[in-house]
């Protein structure tokens, strides 16, 4: 996976933080007497995933790993260590998730809180700790400090600290949601194929949540109509201008004349499309996901809400203008990613309409 857009590693601040993390993880990598491969398929019941991300999207990208763990270790409980404040709600539907431990936003600025948290991790006596991300030394350091019996993660020259089951990153697989699943399968002694089936992102919405979302959507659109949801917000260079969206939606609406269009509002609560369409706002990701799950098509740029839509099960079109598509695309049935770099909006709209043509 490239480090495009989301993973600039060249700033002096990040270099200093990387050196601190390397010191933090020195020589602390779990039980060094454990065998290299394979990881035992039984006797593992307490599992820790360390992912020090703050974002909604990267938290949802852990759900394929949760699905793989659920299948491989059906009697296990998984704790998640994260900086994402929304993680407890995002993962609330997963029966195998026990505790979601929230790291302080500035970990090195809260030494007392961190010391207390790390003591708790060591006291939990985890059987397995997983470092799920290829480019984070912080995740590796947290795995090391957990002192779990076994530790699994992808290995690269960017990583510091040993694991009992370090897995070389594959050359032909880059997706951030699939890579930790690959690592676990490889640690179990398998030779996974990059083209094999991987669990999808999954919000695990309940029937009651979906029904409430359907009612909210019906309230917005009036009579029962097929509906397209549009989320026009993305950060920085991943965003599209208002004029771009206007041209895109003219073509999309013409291709789907029987569909209503609903705007999904960003955290600011303001329309980015000039209040031309009925709009829905929620500060609660599961409530938002419940409504999106009832859409016939969801369209957005590359962002966390794109992954939320995919995890809700909605047909999802992700529009990429800057990020690495191979590393962050939406995958699975009724999901598609489109490279919009340098392409006119009308052409991208036509591609989306052709891919998701509902007749």
Regions found by a protein language model. Give the residues of each.
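Catalytic machinery of carbohydrate-active enzymes
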Residues: 1-359
């Amino acid at each position: 996976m490239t480090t495009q857009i989301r993973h600039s590693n060249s700033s002096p601040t990040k270099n200093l933080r990387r050196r601190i993390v390397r010191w933090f993880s020195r020589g602390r990598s779990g039980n060094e007497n454990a065998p290299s491969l394979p990881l035992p398929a039984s006797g593992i019941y307490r599992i820790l995933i360390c992912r020090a991300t703050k974002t909604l999207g990267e938290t949802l990208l852990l759900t394929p790993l949760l699905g793989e763990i659920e299948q491989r270790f059906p009697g296990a409980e998984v704790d998640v260590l994260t900086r994402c404040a929304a993680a407890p709600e995002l993962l609330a539907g997963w029966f195998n998730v026990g505790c979601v431990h929230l790291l302080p936003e500035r970990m090195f600025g809260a030494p007392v809180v961190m010391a207390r948290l790390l003591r708790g991790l060591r006291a939990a006596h985890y059987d397995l700790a997983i470092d799920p991300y290829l480019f984070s030394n912080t995740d590796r350091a947290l795995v090391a400090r957990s002192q779990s019996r076994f530790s699994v993660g992808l290995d690269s020259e960017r990583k510091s600290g040993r694991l009992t089951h370090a897995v070389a990153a594959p050359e032909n697989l880059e997706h951030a949601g699939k890579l930790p699943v690959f690592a676990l399968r490889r640690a179990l002694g398998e030779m996974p194929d990059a083209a094999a089936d991987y669990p999808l992102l999954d919000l695990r919405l309940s029937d009651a949540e979906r029904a409430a979302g359907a009612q909210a959507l019906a309230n917005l659109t009036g009579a029962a109509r097929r509906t397209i949801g549009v989320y026009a917000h993305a950060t920085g260079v991943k965003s599209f201008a208002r004029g771009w969206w206007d041209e895109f939606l003219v073509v999309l609406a013409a291709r789907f004349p029987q569909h209503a269009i609903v705007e999904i509002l960003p955290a600011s609560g303001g329309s980015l499309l000039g209040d031309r369409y009925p709009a829905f706002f929620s500060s609660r990701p599961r409530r938002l996901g419940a409504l999106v799950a009832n859409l016939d098509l969801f369209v957005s740029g590359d962002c966390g809400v794109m992954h939320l839509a995919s995890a809700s099960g909605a047909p999802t079109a992700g529009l990429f203008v800057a990020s690495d598509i191979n590393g962050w695309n939406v995958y699975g049935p009724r999901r598609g990613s489109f490279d919009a770099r340098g392409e006119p909006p009308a052409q991208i709209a036509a591609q989306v309409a052709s891919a998701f043509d509902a007749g």
